[in-house]
């Protein structure tokens, strides 16, 4: 019997988060793992930091992490939402209204 890969749920929880250093802001979204939302945000933040320190990315967020250091950033959950589509809609709306300087696009 061949096992089929299990389809990922499309309605799991996601969180919209804000990273800030001084007046520079980044808005992002990630899924909530089986653990707590705080752990999921920490995992995502550490991925941003790892990418900034080990890859030669010139994305605005990576440059800011290298310039100011990871400890200078305030990392916070903005909203927890059920469903990927809803989370991305909120992220896009926040990007339009907040106009964060560290996001690489302005969806």
Where are these regions (language model features)?
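Conserved short loop/helix modules at catalytic or binding sites
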Residues: 31-84
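GIY-YIG nuclease catalytic motif and its immediate N-terminal context
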Residues: 1-39, 89
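A positively charged, amphipathic N-terminal helix/segment that binds anionic biomolecules
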Residues: 4, 16-19, 26, 45-47, ...
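Boundary/linker segments flanking structured domains
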Residues: 1-11, 70-107
